[in-house]
Regions:
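Glycine-rich N-terminal segment of FAD-binding domains in flavoprotein oxidoreductases
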Residues: 2-64
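General beta-strand structural signal in soluble alpha/beta enzymes
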Residues: 15-16, 36-40, 47, 59-61, ...
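FAD-binding subdomain of flavoenzyme oxidoreductases
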Residues: 67-70, 81, 85-212
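Conserved glycine-rich FAD pyrophosphate-binding loop
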Residues: 8, 47-56, 60-62, 273-427
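Short amphipathic alpha-helix segments
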Residues: 209-238, 324-336, 367-375
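Glycine-/small-residue-rich beta-strand-loop submotif within the FAD-binding core of flavoenzymes
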Residues: 5-6, 49-86, 123-124, 190
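Short, conserved charged micro-motifs
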Residues: 21-24, 87, 207-213, 259-268, ...
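A conserved active-site cap/scaffold subdomain adjacent to cofactor or substrate pockets
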Residues: 197, 203-209, 243-281
């Protein structure tokens, strides 16, 4: 078994250095009927960078690592897929800017790959999924395409100001897991570094209380980051050896600003709301030392997979979007030692919900069956899998036949030979 989510490895790897080489690689694959799997950094939680079929070729984009343009005034950057968060951070920091980091995604990850796959960003509750603007790439049939200003023949570097809306066709390439083509250049948004940052904690005795509190605080539009974690996840987040002194659930709220007075009035507002909720807004979490600093560190520099895994153990996240009522029903499906994170989306109308399965290495086959059983129950309850894994793709297709019939017709239009990451997303 290659990984929890995939049994296959690519037969070989190619490393293009420019979009022309990407285009030639795709054209050759079409001639030879060879499946391609685009890889930027392999840090996407569900191993979508590994093939779902035999004899695939990995297209390693790590050598395409140029920061084409950085606009500090408008807080945007045009980058290639090999640019990592660590690489982009240095020039951004010099301009007083920062990137929007993703949950579980380390600094060595591709910025473009992370944003294209819509890995959940800590900043989504505040900024929503608008981290990408225009893009350029090569379709699965070998044709070059671009969106917004990048599609125009202007001799200027700042081709990002005319982006795309969520309803436009370009968004099909988001969360597509490389099934429609390869993006070779894209504009991403940046944020200003705030000198004042404050972390607050709100303890909850159950998951129902946690989702209610998340809804209440996100409605104020004051948190820059906000999420809830159960005590298993929380202990790992804070580097604690056990969960004894932690509440069953903790809502974490981060406020940012440019003056201490700004943080002070935000704290006053949030404290008043906490009292209405019959709870307490705290800057400490039990006996944990420097809990707030540890949260800020994890947000700015996520640990990644190793946050949850130890020697001899495995970790498998279940990536979903669900309503509060669906979450409450789903919680009982997971073992007591499971970690879980919930982040409000759309002002609390729904949530990014990431419970997980823990297991000892060697138990993968058994845990796969558990994973699929749980996924089936979640699908029947109406829970959405925004990025299906290779394991549950068929299940997701079976529950959404009309949607995937349309997706297949779109894929056939741009990938007539079915060479781009076949069998991903059930395509």
């Amino acid at each position: 078994m290659t990984s929890f989510f995939s049994d296959y490895q690519p037969q070989k790897t190619v490393q293009p250095t420019c979009y022309e080489e990407v285009q030639e690689t795709i054209k050759k694959a079409n001639r030879d009927r060879t499946p391609l799997v685009p890889v930027s950094s392999g840090t996407n939680l569900q191993d979508t960078h590994l093939p779902s079929v035999k004899d695939a070729i990995a297209v390693d984009l790590s050598r395409m690592n140029k920061i084409t343009y950085l606009d500090a005034r408008n807080r945007d950057a045009v980058i290639e897929p090999g640019v990592t968060f660590a690489q982009l951070e240095a020039p951004c920091k010099a301009e007083g800017l920062r990137t929007l980091t993703a949950i579980e995604v380390p600094k060595e990850a591709s910025v473009l790959g992370t944003y294209l796959e819509m890995m959940p960003l800590y900043g989504w509750p505040k900024y929503h999924p608008w981290e990408m603007l225009t893009m350029k790439g090569v379709r699965a049939d070998g044709e070059v395409f671009a969106t917004g200003q990048m599609a125009m023949s202007q001799d200027r570097p700042d081709k990002y100001s005319w982006g795309v809306s969520l309803a436009q066709v370009a968004r099909l390439y988001c969360q597509a897991q490389g099934t429609l083509g390869i993006i070779t250049n894209a504009a991403v948004t940046l944020k200003t570094i705030a000198p004042e940052n404050q972390v607050f904690f709100f303890s909850c005795n159950n998951i129902s209380r946690a989702t209610k509190v998340l809804k209440a605080f996100i409605a104020t539009e004051e948190p820059h980051e906000i999420f809830a974690v159960n005590k298993t996840y929380c202990s790992e987040l804070l580097g604690q050896g056990d969960t004894k002194n932690l509440p069953p659930w903790t809502v974490v709220i981060v406020t940012r600003g440019f003056e201490k007075a700004e943080i002070a009035y935000k704290k006053k507002d949030l404290t008043a709301l906490a009292k209405q909720l019959k709870g307490e807004l705290a800057t400490r979490l039990g006996s944990v030392k420097n809990a707030g600093a540890k949260i800020l560190s994890e947000i700015s520099n996520p640990t990644g997979f190793s946050l949850h895994s130890e020697d001899g153990s495995g970790w498998a996240p279940v990536v979903t979007i669900a309503t509060d009522s669906q979450i409450q029903k789903a919680a009982g499906l997971f073992p007591k030692d499971s970690g879980s994170l919930i982040m409000p989306l759309q002002a609390g109308g729904c949530f990014y919900y990431q419970p997980d399965l823990r297991y000892s290495l060697g138990e993968e086959k058994k845990v796969r069956k558990t994973y699929l059983t749980i996924c089936e129950k979640l699908l029947k309850a109406g829970v959405t899998f925004p990025r299906p894994s290779a394991l549950n793709a068929k299940q997701v297709v079976a529950h959404n036949p009309s949607y995937f019939k349309l997706l297949r017709s779109i894929k056939k239009g741009v990938d007539p030979n079915n060479i781009m990451n076949p069998k991903k997303l059930g395509l």
